[in-house]
């Protein structure tokens, strides 16, 4: 890190090119190449493959800049023109993408570390877990009325990405090089592949395009911090990490800001506004009325169109009342239900029955999306009927059982944050029978004959850790497992939503 600091401690007059010199450093590409060995890029690299030549990388950058100023197209369909000094330029261009992502991450790491210095913060590891969101939702959402279910727009123009990055990175040479890469990228129209409720990236250069997408989302989310700080004087710790930029509202002329700006801030002044995002989906909950949520919806659509110059469909934002509708988020169906209670008040001669109703946040396991994921991974059909997995038939019996058991344990652990997990019994049934059919297919036998020969060995692989504890402690108490499925259990290592298709 001392080598990195040398470029960031220059005089302010020399800071306009502080990133560009790092692109020509060999250890940057060693870190980028070894990114799979270490989760953090700031660990010391263990080495790199000798088949890469960093000298060729530096020469290639110079060659690209020359081509850019000569207005020649670098990427063509002719394989002979994709050679530079006898090397495949696509391979080294991918390395430059990865190296650029590493370089851009460095100033943010230094800025974040300096931001944490002198601040007393509880560094709790479990705050990184997705299960830490549900206690927050249970505490906050039970007092709210409406929620906006938002799908963040993804088809953003490449030049807007560069302009967004310009507010964070003060290096014109690096931005020109980035602009050239993006416009000459062969599949630039499919950098971010749209999905129904999420987003995905092409397998090549995932780190680089994920970084650009995070810039885009950060710029989009900064509007909430801006309005929050303008509408109230409450101190927000998270807002301190955002950097000042050109005020976006000056670019919106006609519909959104036709009234006085203070009046608009008064409309959006809501001390009970909460925002949560995961990947390409976010929720905005409020204690206000449906009129306020419709104004938020109208405002966000115009904000995307006027500031990001992208057309956004209003159907990407749904308004739902928490007491009547369920919210599909992170694989859970969450809602706020009225829990009735009756209190009997006894006086000297008379008694009264008082009915009360309290709001309770509830989360259920969404069985339909899970069956759809199992069907996509070829564990079952669309109706949930188990099928064999032919591609795993060449594995050993223990590997097959371990894979199926691991998939179920991951799904069970992820959905353990729900109070009602009885639908997981159906997922266990699908995976167990799919495992049995795969093994029977391998041994050219029937499922009944194979299960009779295997016995309870297959069953034990599909016990979660909690079930094993209760099963060993109370082997004859079958009701104990049922009580377990009515408890909320949180884990500190749930960093991503469980998807059976990722276990291929």
From Swiss-Prot:
Predominant subcellular localization, coarse grouping: plastid
rRNA-binding is among the record's keywords: no
Coiled coil region boundaries: none
Keyword field: Chloroplast, mRNA processing, Plastid, RNA-binding, tRNA processing
UniProt-listed InterPro entries: Domain_X (IPR024937), Maturase_MatK (IPR002866), Maturase_MatK_N (IPR024942)
GO molecular function: RNA binding
Keyword Transcription regulation part of the UniProt annotation: no
Gene Ontology biological-process annotations: mRNA processing; RNA splicing; tRNA processing
GO cellular component labels: chloroplast
Location within or outside the cell: Plastid, Chloroplast
Top-rank taxon: Eukaryota
Similarity annotation: Belongs to the intron maturase 2 family. MatK subfamily.
Function: Usually encoded in the trnK tRNA gene intron. Probably assists in splicing its own and other chloroplast group II introns.
Name of the protein described by the UniProt record: Maturase K
Species: Prionotes cerinthoides (Climbing heath)
């Amino acid at each position: 890190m001392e080598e990195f600091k040398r470029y960031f401690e220059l005089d302010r007059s020399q800071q306009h090119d502080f990133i560009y010199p790092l692109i020509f450093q060999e250890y940057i590409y060693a870190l980028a190449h070894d990114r799979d060995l270490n989760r953090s890029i700031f660990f010391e690299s263990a080495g790199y493959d000798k088949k890469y030549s960093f000298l060729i990388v530096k020469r290639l950058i110079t060659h690209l800049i020359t081509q850019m100023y000569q207005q020649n197209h670098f990427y063509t369909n002719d394989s002979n023109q994709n050679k530079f000094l006898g090397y495949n330029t696509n391979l080294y261009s991918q390395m430059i993408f990865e190296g650029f992502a590493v370089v851009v991450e460095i100033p943010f790491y230094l800025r974040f570390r300096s931001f944490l210095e002198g601040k007393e913060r509880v560094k709790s590891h479990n705050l990184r877990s997705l299960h830490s969101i549900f206690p927050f939702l249970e505490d906050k959402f039970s007092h709210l009325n409406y929620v906006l279910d938002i799908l963040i727009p993804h088809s953003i123009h490449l030049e807007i990405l560069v302009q967004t990055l310009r507010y964070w990175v003060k290096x014109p040479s690096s931005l020109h090089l980035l602009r050239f890469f993006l416009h000459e990228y062969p599949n630039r129209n499919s950098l971010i592949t749209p999905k129904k409720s999420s987003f995905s990236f092409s397998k090549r250069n995932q780190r680089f395009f994920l970084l650009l997408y995070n810039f885009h989302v950060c710029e989009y989310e900064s509007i909430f911090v801006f309005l929050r700080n303008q509408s109230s004087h409450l101190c927000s710790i998270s807002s301190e990490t955002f950097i000042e930029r050109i005020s976006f509202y000056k670019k919106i002329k006609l519909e959104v800001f036709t009234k006085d700006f203070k009046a608009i801030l008064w409309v959006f002044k809501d001390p009970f506004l909460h925002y949560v995002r995961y990947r390409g989906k976010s929720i905005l909950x409020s204690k206000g009325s449906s009129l306020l949520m419709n104004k938020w919806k109208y405002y966000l659509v115009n904000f995307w169109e006027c500031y990001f110059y992208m057309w956004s469909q209003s159907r990407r934002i749904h308004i739902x009342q928490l007491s009547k509708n369920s919210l599909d988020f992170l694989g859970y169906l969450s809602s706020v239900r009225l829990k009735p209670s009756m209190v009997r008040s006894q006086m000297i001669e008379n008694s009264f029955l008082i009915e009360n109703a309290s709001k309770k946040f509830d989360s259920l396991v969404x069985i339909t999306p899970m069956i759809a994921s199992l069907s996509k991974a070829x564990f079952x059909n669309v109706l949930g009927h188990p099928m064999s997995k032919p591609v795993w038939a060449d594995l050993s019996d223990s590997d097959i059982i371990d894979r199926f058991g691991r998939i179920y344990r991951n799904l069970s652990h992820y959905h353990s944050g729900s109070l009602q997990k009885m639908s997981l019994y159906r997922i266990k049934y699908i995976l167990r029978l799919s495992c049995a059919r795969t093994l029977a297919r391998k041994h050219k036998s029937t499922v009944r004959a194979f299960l009779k020969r295997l016995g309870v060995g297959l069953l034990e692989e599909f016990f979660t850790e909690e079930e094993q504890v209760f099963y060993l402690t109370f082997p004859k108490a079958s009701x104990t497992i049922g009580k377990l499925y009515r408890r909320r259990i949180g884990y500190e290592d749930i960093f991503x939503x469980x998807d059976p298709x990722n276990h291929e």
